[in-house]
């Protein structure tokens, strides 16, 4: 998938225009750097997110008000065996929420309030997550 074209299409939607939700892209992550990050963190990212990172390291929206995809060096791997058998990856945020990737057998995206602890299901896939962001639902 060409993520830039997909996201530009999302910014042209009626809701994105009404909410002035724009997008800024970054240079791609080199595959060797991404593989090194995965090995260091003992995580293999879902193909959908890997393919995005290989096209753009981050995604800024609303002129810095939202970061649907933080630059890779700002991602946090959260390991809490009491809460989840698999690690979570904090990869995006807005002023009110942090976005977490569940790395279990069915990777999904959850969100939690920035100053809260209860996560809630947000999207089943990365592309659905981006659709919700650009509809102003993040």
Regions found by a protein language model. Name each.
Residues 1-105, 137:
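A surface-exposed partner-binding patch
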Residues 107-114:
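Intrinsically disordered, low-complexity regulatory segments enriched in Ser/Thr/Pro
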């Amino acid at each position: 998938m060409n993520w830039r074209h997909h996201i530009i299409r999302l910014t042209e939607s009626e809701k994105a225009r009404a909410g002035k939700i724009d997008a800024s892209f970054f240079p791609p992550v080199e595959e060797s750097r991404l593989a090194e990050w995965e090995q260091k963190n003992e995580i293999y990212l879902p193909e959908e997110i890997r393919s995005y990172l290989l096209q753009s390291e981050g995604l800024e929206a609303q002129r810095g008000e939202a970061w649907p995809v933080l630059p890779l060096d700002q991602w946090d791997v959260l390991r809490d065996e009491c809460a989840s058998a698999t690690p979570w990856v904090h990869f995006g945020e807005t002023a009110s929420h942090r976005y977490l990737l569940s790395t279990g057998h069915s990777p999904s995206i959850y969100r939690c309030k920035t100053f809260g602890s209860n996560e809630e299901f947000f999207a089943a896939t990365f592309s659905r997550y981006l659709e919700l962001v650009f509809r102003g639902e993040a």
